[in-house]
Structure formats: structure tokens, C-alpha cells
Amino acid sequence: KWCAPLLDLPAHCYPQSYFARRIELGASEVNRLFLTACGVTHSLIETGFRGTEIHGPDGMAKLAGHKVDKVIRLETTAEKLLDTGTVTSESFVTDFARELAIAAKGAVGLKSIVAYRYGLHFEPSPPSQQEVQKAIEPVLRQVDSGAPARIDDPILLRHLIFAGLELNLPIQFHIGYGD
């Protein structure tokens, strides 16, 4: 019910005391105390946004003291692949399918941020390979110029979703913070 008692403080302590105690214990210990006390027994974690700045599944499992499974973000997987500079418009469909299958090993689900990048009013059918090849060309030029890949073309976003469906994993559609 109250966070302060988990830190060995009175429930209604002064804010200064609360923050001082958090600083004294350190972020890892405070996170461990809160996560183990919350009663959650299984978590899912998606590391596609600022993945190097957060705990991955193993780190969260250690902190939380319970099972943590991973969810793979489609757009991040594709953009990391494109940023390697090894992809062509002809190879993208096959290369992405391979990379997604590798990334999804052991995952319990996938996630798309199509709503954030384009919206949810998109053609609900898979694009043709020719459409994907044409749509990926501007992204490849972007990467060739030294900029990081960013997929926001509706044809490419649809392709990622339909490629994800081939893995028979559930897909979460991010439509806002906290979903």
C-alpha cells in the first residue's frame, strides 16, 4: 500500500526522508525491494526502445525475483538490420524474415508501433514484394547517407506486421503510453 515502509521508513514520512533513503539504498536495491513486494509473478519486457538503457529480461528477473519473458519490437529489429548497411531492396524481405526469426527465439510475443509511426488506418492486407522493394529504397538511401534507418512508410510497416504473423506469436499494437 505504501512505498516508504518497504524502505524501513514510516508510511507517512517526510518526502526529504523518503528521497534520502532511496539515494542511500541505490536504484538497484530500491527496484529490487519494490518489484519483489508488488506481488507480480511473471513479467514481459520489450527492449526495443532505449534497450541499452534498461534492464533486459535477465536483469529484470534478477531484480524482480520472478520469471521475465521478452517481447520483440518489429520496427527496431528491421531498423537494426538496415543500419548494418548490408541490405538491398531485393534482399530486405528475406533478410528481415531471417533476422526476426533469430530475434524472436525464446520470445513470447511481438510489438508494433505502427500507430505511433503512421496510425491505425492502414490497408489491412500484406503488401506485395514489389511494393516492399520500392518502399524500402528511400530508407536504404537514408542509411547510405549516414543517417539511422527509420521505418514509417505504411507499406513497410504493414510488411513488418505480416512478417511477424508468420511466427505465430501474439502482436501487441502500441497505441499510447501504458498500453
Question: What are the functions of these language-model segments?
Answer:
Residues 177-178:
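Short glycine/proline-centered loop/turn elements that form peptide/ligand docking sites
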Residues 1-167:
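Metal-cofactor-binding active-site regions of metalloenzymes
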Residues 174:
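Conserved binding/catalytic microenvironments
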